[in-house]
Amino acid sequence: MRFFDREKELNYLKTYVQLEPNSILFVYGPKSSGKSTVMRRVIKELENSNIVFFYYNLREHATYSKEEFLEVFFEKDKNKVVRNNLILDLKVFKIGIEENYDFSKLSLNDVFKKIKSSINTVIKNGKKPVLIFDELQKLKNIYFNGNKPLLNELFNLFVSLTKMEHLCHVICLTSDTLFIEEIYRNSSLKNASKYYLIDWLRKNSIRNILKEEGFSEEEINYCLNYLSLPYEIVDLIENKKLGLTVEETIKQWINIEKDGLKYLIDTTDLDVEKIYMPYLSLITR
């Protein structure tokens, strides 16, 4: 996907990872607003720097249990820092663990020791480690020894790595607004975390992008009432190349939303007319 106008966000994150670690950074925003794309661009542009990125895209994995989490998080290898060869387009790494290690015997304290040992190895080599978790909330329902919630214990570790010891940056990406609210109310993270919003694209940015792609002023003005997300712009540009008009593409979107609302209405016992009809009238105008 084309990298749309995100210079402000890109510069913020590139600068942030080069500062001394002092807090956990939560990067949040609407689904599909481009958080992962921006973060991956940061990694790409800094791949020849002295920064070592440990990047975990949790949306790609079914991390529903302790064992699955460990298999995603660690790479069995003789080295403590291992190149993640499953991500071909980025120079990113995983925490190494002994090849004969039995994951079923790994305690939470063992996990933390392994993480810290790998981070210290990076630092001893004169480099700066950065831990990145994409869609961190997927770890919410994982418990370790003694039914300890993994996420709460990870946050304690993150505070130690950043605020207390200044060893490593920790960046957590999420599109779950309820999760962000939970984090914000977490007293253990007070004064130990920062928040950065990657929101929908601004209208001026959308206008400039569409102008570059050859859309007329009339088409652009029509689009601005409906566009906000990068994937929508890509869809609009691709459909134009395929011969669909702007109106036809947007009508497709509206019909999809309308069908979704209709399904919701058909499968609920709530007062349909009172709750949903005002919204249906808006999207069918």
Per-region residue spans from a language model:
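N-terminal pre-P-loop "Q-motif" helix
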Residues: 2-14
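Short, conserved phosphate/pyrophosphate- and ester-handling motifs at nucleotide-, phospho-/glycolipid
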Residues: 6, 36, 229-230
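Conserved catalytic network of the ASCE P-loop NTPase/AAA+ motor domain
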Residues: 18-20, 121-125, 160-167, 188-190
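P-loop NTPase nucleotide-binding core
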Residues: 21-145
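Sensor-1/coupling segment of RecA-like P-loop NTPase cores
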Residues: 138-186, 195-198
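Helix-loop-helix "sensor" segment of P-loop NTPases
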Residues: 180-225, 238-248
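Amphipathic alpha-helical "lid/sensor" segments that cap RecA-like P-loop NTPase cores
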Residues: 215-274
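Regulatory alpha-helical "coupling" segment adjacent to P-loop NTPase cores
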Residues: 270-285
